[in-house]
């Protein structure tokens, strides 16, 4: 189900070999027998995106550097793309990786995102950042969130001032749902500090509010 280009200008060259022993979302045990010979289908399709920014986003220019990279619906495709390309450590500065449900664009204007918001986790340690990114990816494609239908996707942002992850959701006004998602996400990535939820509508303002709407 390959499509479009890979972010070759922003990442290291992919490894020559692709991991093939990935019959489950989580890394399988060594030597584990695999009964099914075919690919392991996911519950839904997901799409990787990337955004390599050459200058600060502003106004109508926002989103012009956003590119769709690959849509997949099997465990094997996920691990192949992750291992070769979609590790944050392969990104140059001022760039983003996204994993969103197929058909949903990582933009405020997308109908699935327009009334939503995001939980944000800052991270200044590269190893921890990459681990949290991978754990979130596996939780999403493995449908581990009870409120999975309210989740749009995840963004990994690499910046000189500090990296961060942002989990985008659909219905920002539903506090109970967002709080449950935030708590579950913290469990998934083993994060103990407070995190905040911001409405996309707040972020769109000329002078965005510095505080989040919800905190867990």
From Swiss-Prot:
Residues 1-23 are annotated as: Disordered. InterPro entries: TIF_eIF4e-like, TIF_eIF_4E, TIF_eIF_4E_CS. Disulfide bonds join 113-152. According to the redox status, the Cys-113-Cys-152 disulfide bridge may have a role in regulating protein function by affecting its ability to bind capped mRNA. GO terms for cellular component: eukaryotic translation initiation factor 4F complex. Recognizes and binds the 7-methylguanosine-containing mRNA cap during an early step in the initiation of protein synthesis and facilitates ribosome binding by inducing the unwinding of the mRNAs secondary structures. Belongs to the eukaryotic initiation factor 4E family. This is Eukaryotic translation initiation factor isoform 4E-2. It comes from Zea mays.
